[in-house]
């Protein structure tokens, strides 16, 4: 994947004459020691990240770790003290104010924790407000605002007012307002933190669905570990202004960089964080491709050659058809029937988004590995009993 957003050796030091801090940084003094000596606050220290196009990249850490400062450096709401912020290879730390406005209008948008909706304006007008300030004509901004509201499921509330909406719906308006400019990059600063847990989960699911359709580059700030694990393709952990580890949720869980990260991830409920798609294994063994010339005899030979009791049938477009067994294929052959007649009732396929906690009974009772499919019924892979147990055992390994 191409790199969409990159930061190199980025610093933010708050206070007058911030350059004074660098000699102490070079001497290895801590954030607290620098503050004591100079009165300067080290917000971000020598951060470097490369964020790929189309990924959800989560930055997390405890309060004061620098994560909210970091996200504001990415669109220059806060000016960096030193370092580069590259969008599509262009260092926005060096561009003019006019060029920066164009970047904010067309390439990058932000969603805050506070909904920040205008109470006297309708949902539609709130959604279009940023475009109005940018000078976009009324017809175009109305069309784009309605499209953004459709994306978040609020098109029927276009003429309602903010006080007529629930908290979750108001945050959807905030998200729609950012989506209306169709940005390449979406910055989200603890956007769901103020919501009730159930609504927060719904919004996380909504974001994942939107991402599947539009593949924007999303930088998501969070202090909620479960949230980060649920939505993040990769996670960066910050401590005292520094990025101490970057990796996939799985990589960080299995190989924490230090005690801070290890403590951060202690007690995470693997069964709630990971879903079927995260552990499903796609293997060519036992995979039967349904074509006009491929019947029960060919399928039976394939399974016997691979020494497998069960197989999984897919057709054109990778669409999952069902499972077969050696016995069901032999029966279909005896009765001179086609491959469809050999399909067995179990195991039923599970949705790729199913949490591991909901798979235990299904996988445990299935006669073979359980097939996993996406929302379009496309084959994702299989989950065996051993695979599920190994995935769930990672929590014990990390906490032991």
UniProtKB/Swiss-Prot annotation:
Lipid bilayer topology: Peripheral membrane protein
Protein residues bound to ATP: 61-68
Keywords: Amino-acid transport, ATP-binding, CBS domain, Cell inner membrane, Cell membrane, Membrane, Nucleotide-binding, Repeat, Transport
Protein location: Cell inner membrane
InterPro entries referenced in this protein's UniProt entry, alphabetically: AAA+_ATPase (IPR003593), ABC_osmolyte_uptake_ATP-bind (IPR051921), ABC_transporter-like_ATP-bd (IPR003439), ABC_transporter-like_CS (IPR017871), CBS_dom (IPR000644), CBS_dom_sf (IPR046342), Gly-betaine_transp_ATP-bd (IPR005892), P-loop_NTPase (IPR027417)
Annotated Gene Ontology cellular component terms: ATP-binding cassette (ABC) transporter complex; membrane; ProVWX complex
Main location: membrane
UniProt entry tagged with the keyword Methyltransferase: no
Example of a GO MF term: ATP binding
GO BP term, pick one: amino acid import across plasma membrane
Domain annotation CBS: ranges: 282-341, 343-400
Bilayer-crossing regions: none
Protein's UniProt keywords contain Ubl conjugation: no
Source species, domain of life: Bacteria
Residues of the ABC transporter domain: 29-265
Annotated signal sequence range: none
Record function comment: Part of the ProU ABC transporter complex involved in glycine betaine and proline betaine uptake. Probably responsible for energy coupling to the transport system.
Quaternary structure annotation from Swiss-Prot or TrEMBL: The complex is composed of two ATP-binding proteins (ProV), two transmembrane proteins (ProW) and a solute-binding protein (ProX).
Family of this protein: Belongs to the ABC transporter superfamily.
Protein known as: Glycine betaine/proline betaine transport system ATP-binding protein ProV
Lineage of source species: Bacteria, Pseudomonadati, Pseudomonadota, Gammaproteobacteria, Enterobacterales
The encoding gene: proV
């Amino acid at each position: 994947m191409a790199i969409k957003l990159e930061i190199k050796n980025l610093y933010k030091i708050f206070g007058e004459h911030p350059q004074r801090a660098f000699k102490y940084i070079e001497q290895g003094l801590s954030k607290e020691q620098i503050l004591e000596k100079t009165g300067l606050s080290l917000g971000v220290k020598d951060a470097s990240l490369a964020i790929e196009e189309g990924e959800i990249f989560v930055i997390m850490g405890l309060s004061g770790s620098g994560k909210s400062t970091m996200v504001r450096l990415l669109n220059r709401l806060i000016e960096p003290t030193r370092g580069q912020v590259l969008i599509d290879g262009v260092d926005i730390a060096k561009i003019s104010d006019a060029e920066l406005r164009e970047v904010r209008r067309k390439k990058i948008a932000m969603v805050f924790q506070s909904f920040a909706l205008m109470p006297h304006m309708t949902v539609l007008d709130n959604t279009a407000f940023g475009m109005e300030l940018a000078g976009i004509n009324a017809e175009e901004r109305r069309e784009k605002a309605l499209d953004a509201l459709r994306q978040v499921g609020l098109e029927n509330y276009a003429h309602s007012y903010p006080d007529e909406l629930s908290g979750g719906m108001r945050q959807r308006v905030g998200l729609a307002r950012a989506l209306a400019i169709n940005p390449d990059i979406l910055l989200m600063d603890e956007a769901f933190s103020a919501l009730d847990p159930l609504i927060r989960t719904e919004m996380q699911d909504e974001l994942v669905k939107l991402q599947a359709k539009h593949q924007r580059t999303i930088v998501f700030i969070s202090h909620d570990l479960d949230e980060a694990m649920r939505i993040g393709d990769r996670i960066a952990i910050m401590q005292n202004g520094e990025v101490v580890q970057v990796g996939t949720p799985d990589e960080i869980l299995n190989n924490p960089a230090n005690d801070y990260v290890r403590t951060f991830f202690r007690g995470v409920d693997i069964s709630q964080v990971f879903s079927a798609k995260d552990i499903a294994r796609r293997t060519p063994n036992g995979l039967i491709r349904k074509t006009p010339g491929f019947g029960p005899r060919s399928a039976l030979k394939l399974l016997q050659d691979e020494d497998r009791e069960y197989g999984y049938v897919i057709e054109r477009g990778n669409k999952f058809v069902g499972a077969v067994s050696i016995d069901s294929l032999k029966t279909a052959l005896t009765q001179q029937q086609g491959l469809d007649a050999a399909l067995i009732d179990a195991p039923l396929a599970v949705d790729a988004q199913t949490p591991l906690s909901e798979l235990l009974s299904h996988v445990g009772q299935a006669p073979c590995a359980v097939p996993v499919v996406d929302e379009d019924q496309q084959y994702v892979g299989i989950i065996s009993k051993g695979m599920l147990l190994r995935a769930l055992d990672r929590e014990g390994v990390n906490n032991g």
